[in-house]
Amino acid sequence: MFAGIALLAVSFAWGQTIVAPQQRPEKTSFAIVTDQVTWEKCRPEIENYRAVLEQEQLPAYILAGQWKNPEQIKELLMRLYRESRLEGAVFIGDIPIPMIRKAQHMTSAFKMDEEKSPRLDSSVPSDRFYDDFDLKFDYLGQDTTSALFFYYNLAADSPQALCCDIYTGRIKPLEDGTDRYQQIRDYLNKAVAAHQENNILDQFVSYTGEGSYSNSLTAWRMEQMILREQLPGVFDRENNARFMRYSMWDYPKEEVIAALQREDLDMLIFHEHGMPYRQYISATPRTHDPEEYTEFLKREFRSKLRTVADRQGDVAGQMKKWCGEYHLDTSWFSGAFDPEWIRKDSIADAQLGIVLEDVPSIAPNARFVIFDACYNGDFREKDYIAGRYIFSKGKCVVAFANSVNVLQDKSANDLFGWLGFGTRIGLWARYTNILESHIIGDPTFCFSSGREGMDCNTWLTTSESPAFWLEMLRDSPYADLQNMALLKLFQQEYPGISDTLRMRFETSPYAVVRYTCMSLLEELNDQNFREVLKLAVTDPYEFIRRIAIHRMGRIGAPEFLPFIIDTYLNDYLSERVNFNVLTALEAYRLSLIHI
């Protein structure tokens, strides 16, 4: 059975089962990777899942085994990539988790002292081990308490930037007291049903929580403009898109839940703070009532005191310190350890976020949820938010979330247009991944295209000719198709790419294209990049201005100083831009600054 014969011979030596596709993998293929017990307990559902993929012309291998380490799996994936044009894989059940160290320069925000902090906490769970074949790692050992965790240093002679060869997703059951194999069976049945829908991406919600983007309205409102560029026409119709912000309600949690429960909702993106067990939806509401504000402060003091007690700290000493600092008396701390006040404060706190226990009753229906947040996708945990979403009884089938903390000053909407054009989630993620980002759920899920003549999945898996992408760059009216063309030409080191990127930045009407040009030029770090930065500080798109000022500060070239000062004088109402201006000015001697 084609390449499967050779692989099958290898598999028995390792105690593995490999089932070759029923279709010959000519243009592309996919791998369903599972552990032996999950294969035995969920075989009908896994085979049904494979069948629906093959109906979509995606031949799928099944790789089942008692995996001893991540290298076993990676070797098979690399072989399928060479022999059968593998485009991606999904990990179902108990699949080894690479815990990456010495790679914090490749994360967007995660920084922790690897010498002083516990190894479990200071490592990044990352499936880039599996899907970026060029990365090299030095094996450190298996975790002593969790058999799934394997620690690696990023090797000194490894590439120090990501460029994924395939995509991956994880379907890892929760340890929440329910049968883990029934979770997988139910999920795969839901995923198969989702594949059989003819569902166009035309119902979208964005929610921005308290603290995101420094609560800047200027930064928040730009997302609406960007999405209209990426999905032209889709959101011009009434009620197809909704942009929600924490400040629209005192307690927005119920509004968010109502959105998640919509039967017709295709996609929801959260911009918020997070932990594995919680989404921080909002904070204490603003008030002009002194008595109400006083009660909010007392609740905060009670909460902080409980934290001190939980950590076996000096409660009396902390109260004395606060009384001195804030000129308070001890009545401000009254009830901190009273059961009735603890109950009341807990109820009040529950209004501010979505926690693990909330998700089953919410039963989210949004087919695809993006968590632009820290830790919501931390799959090393026994239970975590993104996992709860996909294993719920609702119609949510896939999430995109981060395993550690993540930077706010990054583009969260890259290449969204490809999702609307019917691209598999995994193929989209392959070009937007960072070290900590992961697909939780089925990476082959896609929306229907709704546009004649657009075969994005084939384009991304088979079209490597520069001529193809040059034609798309020249002729396509769609901003994100132009973006992908620029990215492909950049990766292929197309002659003159730097000048092409600068020209496109100077002439494109699309903010998303201009940002792509600037970010790719940053990797080249040439004179064109510096000239584009000077133009970028007055771009209509706030995010471009924000990032341009930040990069000027990192470079610290004297030629940038007049542009930074001009921005300080003229763009002071853009909070995030202004913050970056003040930070950038620290790179310059005070004697050079004249305002």
What kind of feature is each model-predicted range?
Residues 7, 71-250, 259-267, 276, ...:
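Structured catalytic cores of large enzymes
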Residues 27-29, 56-60, 84-88, 199-204, ...:
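Loop/turn elements at helix/coil->beta-strand transitions in domains of secreted/extracellular proteins
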Residues 123-186, 295-411:
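Catalytic cores of nucleophile-dependent amide-cleaving enzymes
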Residues 458, 480-493, 512-525, 545-557, ...:
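Structural detector for internal amphipathic alpha-helices that build alpha-solenoid repeat scaffolds
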Residues 477-478, 509-510, 540-541, 572-574:
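Short inter-helical turns and helix N-cap capping residues of alpha-solenoid HEAT/ARM repeat scaffolds
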Residues 593-595:
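Conserved small/polar residues in nucleotide/adenosyl-binding loops
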